[in-house]
Amino acid sequence: MASMLPPVMLTLPEAQEEFHDLLRKLRDPHNQRKLIDWIKYNWREDDEESPEGILRSIATDIRLHLPIEAVLPSEKIIVPTSGENSDCDPKYTRHVDSFLYDNELLHELTAKGVIESHYCVQCGSTKTKSLTFISHSASRAQIAYMYNVLLPPLDDDKVLLDVGSRLGPILYGAYLYTNVGKIYGIEINGELCRMQREIVMKYGFQDRIEIIDSSIEKRTDLLATADIIVLNNVFEFFMEPNEQIKMWKLIYERVKKKALLVTCPALDVTMESLPDNGIDMDKWVQELDVYNMDAPDMPTDDPELKMIHLYEVINPGKTD
């Protein structure tokens, strides 16, 4: 019976030399670059020092300082009157932050009764309906999808801006998953800015992340210079429709050509809920396909992930 040979174990220099040999065999520099990108996107570590592990740790830290709904008294929530979230009756809607409470933890807390999940349709009866859960943050799964699947590689000469960064998960994800050189989070709530800065300092992110306590109206320079702008549920629950239109017009006019916009929900969904907004979507942006369809263990058909869309600005807008 033939004996099984033990696997060949390489030293680091030997592995590096074999890798260089493999790249040389590809010859085409474009394919060499694609292989390097493929390795970067598809290599996964699952420990406390991995991006996933660090984001879990950050979420644990933040949960200690916030109520479950992760909405501060200093924040004013405005229930949408149009669009797909106009049915969010405050009596039957609960704000549960998806970054802080993933589906597994949410299920555990609802099972224990810590978070209610149903309401009584008729008092004294057994008729119940499910409550609606709303989050104002991207989940950790959405963050991983955004940087590992949706976007192309972000190099150190690029600038990323998160408008309305709140707890900062988009910023921390950009730091951990990409090489993007500068990461700005602009947030109008001073308490949230302080919390973000504490996380940035604790985890040593201050070399690339900067938190700006201001409104985007006062810092249009950031819109004009950013290469990637993230707009995650940014205005809908915090502004009246006329103010939302004002903000979107500002973005429409100030972002530069070829800038990438990451939005949740899709831009057309947002614009449909804001009629007479003066924005010509067809001339302004084109939607881009997912960059890395080969990412492992990443269910790109997941409805939660499909809510996130990527656009390239093809013609900076001008409104009347």
Predicted features, each with a name:
Residues 168-180:
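Conserved SAM-binding loop of SAM-dependent methyltransferases across substrates and taxa
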Residues 188-320:
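Domain-level detector for long C-terminal conserved domains
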Residues 1-136, 140-141, 265, 272, ...:
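Intrinsically disordered, low-complexity glycine/charged-rich regulatory or linker segments
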Residues 158, 181, 227:
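Conserved acidic residues
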Residues 156-166:
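Conserved class I S-adenosyl-L-methionine
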Residues 148-156:
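Glycine-rich helix-loop-beta junction characteristic of Rossmann-like nucleotide cofactor-binding loops
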Residues 182-187:
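Conserved SAM-binding motif I beta-strand of class I
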